[in-house]
């Protein structure tokens, strides 16, 4: 998540109108020379899920209506369309046209498949399809980060090439890199169903936790994380004492 896909915006207006503008936490707002100037300022938080906890089945989309399937790089084109629709009103992609969002989606997904977000774990990445329509309605992609203190900013990127056998050895730290849902199928537990599907192979490989990242201002993502049992990772600079778990 970065400002790569967030355009700087300049809109001429009266200062009184500027004061009444709604704010988005992903942008910095300034009034300069008779115009509102919005500059990208995305900030992210990290959260962690204890994989020993069971995800309640009642929170998950019905297995009668939706089918989980493996996710493959050959699904990239369909995934890009789904991605673009899912993030239509969400930063850092909300300021793009539909064509630009599809392009951004394709680039982001290829980065993940190619390991730029850490080694991609195909065995823990899934699709969800509507049984009645056969339509793709959700996807989750998991990668592996360095095994480190999640409060340390360096824990979220590989400074050196990661070993190729991390997954086979149950090493590295799983990270929920992308999860997205069709706009017409939100609110029925699709994301939670995908999360439950991902948790199973992670547990089987001996992983105890799953990290995730969300952008400040994406309230629906934040609430989804809390509803599914994620806990906020404290900042390494925080002076608050850490809770012992």
Protein language model annotation of sequence segments:
Residues 67-94, 233:
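A short beta-loop-alpha structural element at the N-terminal edge
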Residues 35, 41-66, 238-241:
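Acyl-donor-binding surface of acyltransferase catalytic domains
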Residues 35, 41-43, 192, 204, ...:
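Conserved active-site alpha-helix within GNAT-family acetyltransferase domains
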């Amino acid at each position: 998540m970065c400002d790569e896909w967030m355009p700087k915006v300049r809109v001429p207006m009266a200062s009184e109108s500027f004061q009444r503008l709604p704010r988005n936490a992903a942008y910095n707002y300034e009034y300069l020379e008779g115009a509102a100037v919005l500059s990208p300022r995305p900030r992210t938080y990290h959260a962690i899920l204890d994989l020993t906890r069971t995800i309640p089945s009642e929170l998950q989309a019905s297995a009668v209506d939706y089918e989980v399937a493996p996710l493959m790089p050959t699904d990239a084109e369909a995934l890009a369309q789904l991605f673009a629709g899912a993030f239509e009103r969400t930063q850092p992609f909300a300021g793009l046209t539909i064509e630009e969002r599809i392009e951004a989606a394709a680039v982001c997904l290829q980065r993940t498949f190619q390991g730029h977000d850490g080694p991609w774990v195909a065995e823990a990445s899934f699709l969800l399809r509507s049984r009645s329509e056969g339509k793709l309605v959700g996807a989750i992609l998991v990668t592996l980060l360095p095994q480190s203190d999640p409060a340390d900013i360096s824990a979220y990127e590989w400074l050196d090439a990661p070993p190729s056998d991390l997954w086979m050895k149950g090493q590295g730290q799983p990270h929920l890199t992308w999860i997205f849902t069709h706009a017409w199928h939100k609110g029925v537990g699709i994301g939670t169903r995908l999360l439950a599907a991902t948790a199973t192979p992670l547990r089987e490989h001996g992983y105890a936790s799953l990290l995730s990242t969300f952008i400040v201002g994406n309230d629906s993502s934040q609430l989804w994380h809390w509803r599914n049992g994620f806990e906020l990772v404290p900042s390494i600079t925080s002076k608050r004492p850490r809770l012992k778990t």
